[in-house]
Regions:
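Residue signature of alpha-solenoid helical repeat architecture, marking inter-repeat boundaries
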Residues: 13-14, 47, 85-87, 124-126, ...
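TPR/TPR-like (Sel1-like) alpha-helical repeat modules
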Residues: 151-155, 211, 218, 222-246, ...
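Terminal, low-structured helical/coil segments at or just beyond the last alpha-helical repeat
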Residues: 243-275
């Protein structure tokens, strides 16, 4: 005899599959309202399913509803206890949500725990996490520590398998350039402008199409009184595909790109000249 609950279970499984497809489709087009509606129904069907709680947290972070995101991450973390990989993944997401509300101390605590979990379980640290922790340490004014994190992240990216793929640029190479650029910015914040400029000049040779590196070079050249070099670096930044428009917006540079205060001031001084 077929159990009487079998049709109900089959119907539930079909509903979950349909809702999951709706969730993925909505998220792909950034329709967060539809995505969260699908998640609400999924969580009603499977209230203890970790992936739906994590998805809620991720989508809430993307739509900048950090209060909801943190609540979901807290619930997900409790469910994931004992699974080091899941714990690390959730804590990394929660740290990002904490950054969204400028809760630097607790974001740092979460990133520290992610890296501790990797170490105690025999895994190499994630360079993306190290770079993120560097950002948080910088926001807390701990620029020496931030610089160390950026350097470690850059080295890990650079030494990773698949760093280069023929003549093409890989995601790992982009990560290395970004981390080393952050290291150079932190070096400037610590007062070593000559050292920072030397690092940036090396990066412009390795990543000639990086508008971020070119903009940093312009700011540092201008601060050093090398005005012709500053103008040339800026023109090269503006001629890149990404362009220099974002770097004319100091709020973007400070709050989104997370340049340190000293570098924001140097860029501001250079931009004043161009007005």
């Amino acid at each position: 005899m077929v159990p009487t609950m079998a049709p109900a279970r089959a119907e539930s499984a079909a509903s979950v599959d349909t809702l999951q497809r709706s969730l993925v489709a909505a998220y792909e087009v950034q329709d967060f309202t539809a995505a969260l509606d699908a998640l609400r129904q999924l969580r009603q069907l499977e209230p203890e399913e970790l992936r739906w709680i994590e998805a809620d947290a991720t989508i809430s972070t993307d739509r900048k509803d950090f209060t909801r995101a943190l609540k979901a991450y807290d619930a997900a973390y409790e469910l994931a206890r004992g699974d080091a990989g899941a714990e690390a993944r959730i804590l990394n997401g929660r740290a990002l949500a904490r950054e969204g509300i400028y809760d630097w101390p607790n974001a740092l605590t979460d990133y520290d725990e992610v890296l501790r979990l990797a170490e105690t379980n025999g895994f190499a640290p994630d360079p993306y996490v190290l770079n993120s922790r560097g950002n948080v340490r910088g926001s807390l004014g701990r620029w020496n520590d931030a610089k160390d994190d950026y350097e470690s992240a850059g080295d890990l990216f650079q030494n990773a398998k698949g760093f280069r793929n023929g003549a093409s640029t890989t995601q790992r190479l982009d990560g290395a350039i970004y981390a080393y650029s952050n290291k150079a910015l932190a070096t400037a914040q610590l007062g070593d402008e000559a050292g920072a400029l030397k690092q940036v000049e090396a990066l412009t040779r390795r990543a000639p199409n990086s508008a971020d590196v070119r903009a940093a070079a312009a700011a540092l050249y201008y601060s050093a009184g090398r005005f012709g070099n500053a103008e040339d670096a800026w023109e090269r930044a503006c001629s890149r595909e990404a362009g220099c428009a974002k770097y004319k917006d100091l709020d973007y540079v400070r709050r989104i790109r997370r340049w340190p205060p000293a570098m924001v001031d140097k860029l501001s001084a250079f931009l004043e000249l161009k007005r």
